[in-house]
């Protein structure tokens, strides 16, 4: 048993080695750029953003020699991606989720539901996009950015290029909003918002967890944002992240059911996102580890830190691989419509999120 497992592992490494090595070079450079303080202070870009940018710039070269690297790049975009999503559970504990309460859960669920439904309608009816692309952009805008896009793409087994387009939009609009929110709040452009309300608004409407953390940090410098308000923002965002699990199950089920009824496919086309359950299990494990000081002589804080580092590494690998697979001809042909949909959803998040936050003001805290 051990021998066969080892042989299988060696076979995987051999078949994917060139592509993994090539992707690893991009990952190392991306993580280096994100660690340089002057670059970090200027751009506020995470390693994930640098990875996809570098990947995009190198994509013409990759397509020229893809027969050498395709297997490893595909492995990074699929297998390492799922592992990264599972390990994302090391960023969340059940205690943090419960601290938000039922009303925080309700706010997050409303945002996800309406943004996704609007994405599906506007994307297919107005921008004439296919259903899968509309769903991917909607998931990225509604839940947790690139991680949600990639998780849904993996569940639906859709064309990777659709995921690449969707990831591009959520990365760009997430960064724009990350800078926009603190500036607008410092200029008092959000009437009736105190710091806690702004924290809820950030957590309920920003695309990525990194966007929420970045916006809250900038708000500290620009508007004297207190730590309590920053915590509210992150916790509300984490509630949206945890809702990724039921979201994947529900959407995958209905999408497969619709495909079956319209095209006569068998039930085998239904893909159960087991990694979503593993993600939930990792949250439970992280909660347990956080409650202990050490296990078998090893500090639990070190285990959690390792889990977070491996999560980041896997996601950065996946982002680099996705960037490499961008076909500029296809991108120029359909990218503008995808960005149009993401822009509309951005407006929905800003204005809809503003009024929703006001509606919940006084109940959430």
Swiss-Prot record:
TM region positions: 12-34, 44-63, 83-100, 105-127, 134-153, 163-185, 197-219, 234-256, 269-288, 303-325, 338-360
Signal peptide feature range: none
Highest taxon in the source lineage: Bacteria
InterPro entries in the record: UPF0324_pro
Annotated coiled-coil segments of the chain: none
Keywords associated with the record: Cell membrane, Membrane, Transmembrane, Transmembrane helix
GO cellular component terms, A-Z: plasma membrane
Keyword presence, Cell membrane: yes
Membrane topology: Multi-pass membrane protein
Location(s), subcellular: Cell membrane
PANTHER family linked to this entry: INNER MEMBRANE PROTEIN YEIH-RELATED, UPF0324 INNER MEMBRANE PROTEIN YEIH
Entry's family note: Belongs to the UPF0324 family.
Name of the protein: UPF0324 membrane protein Cj0999c
Organism: Campylobacter jejuni subsp. jejuni serotype O:2 (strain ATCC 700819 / NCTC 11168)
């Amino acid at each position: 048993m051990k021998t066969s497992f080892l042989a299988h592992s060696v076979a995987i490494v051999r078949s994917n080695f060139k592509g993994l090595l090539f992707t690893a070079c991009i990952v190392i450079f991306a993580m280096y750029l994100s660690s340089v303080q002057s670059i970090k202070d200027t751009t506020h870009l995470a390693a994930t953003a640098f990875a996809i940018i570098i990947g995009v710039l190198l994509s013409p070269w990759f397509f020229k020699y893809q027969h050498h690297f395709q297997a490893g790049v595909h492995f990074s975009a699929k297998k390492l991606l799922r592992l990264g999503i599972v390990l994302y559970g090391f960023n969340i504990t059940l205690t943090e989720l419960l601290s938000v309460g039922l009303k925080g859960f309700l706010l997050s669920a409303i945002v996800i539901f309406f943004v996704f439904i609007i994405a599906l309608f506007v994307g297919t009816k107005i921008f004439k996009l296919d259903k899968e692309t509309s769903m991917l952009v909607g998931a990225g805008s509604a839940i947790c950015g690139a991680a949600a896009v990639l998780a849904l793409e993996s569940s639906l087994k859709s064309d990777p290029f659709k995921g690449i387009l969707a990831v591009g939009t959520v990365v760009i609009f997430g960064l724009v909003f990350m800078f926009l929110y603190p500036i607008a709040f410092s200029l008092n452009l959000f009437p009736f918002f105190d710091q806690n309300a702004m924290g809820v608004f950030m957590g309920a409407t920003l695309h990525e967890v990194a966007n929420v953390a970045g916006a809250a940090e900038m708000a500290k410098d620009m508007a004297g944002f207190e730590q309590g308000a920053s915590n509210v923002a992150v916790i509300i965002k984490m509630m949206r992240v945890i809702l990724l699990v039921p979201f994947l199950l529900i959407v995958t089920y209905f999408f497969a059911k619709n495909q079956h009824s319209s095209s006569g496919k068998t039930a085998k086309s239904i893909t159960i996102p087991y990694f979503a359950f593993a993600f939930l299990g990792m949250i439970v494990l992280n909660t347990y580890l956080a409650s202990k000081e050490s296990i078998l002589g090893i500090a639990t804080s070190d285990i959690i830190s390792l889990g977070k580092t491996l999560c980041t590494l896997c996601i950065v690998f996946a982002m680099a691989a996705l960037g490499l697979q961008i076909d500029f001809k296809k991108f120029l042909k359909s990218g503008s419509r995808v960005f149009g949909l993401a822009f509309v959803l951005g407006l929905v998040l800003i204005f809809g999120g503003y009024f929703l936050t006001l509606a919940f003001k006084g109940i959430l805290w």
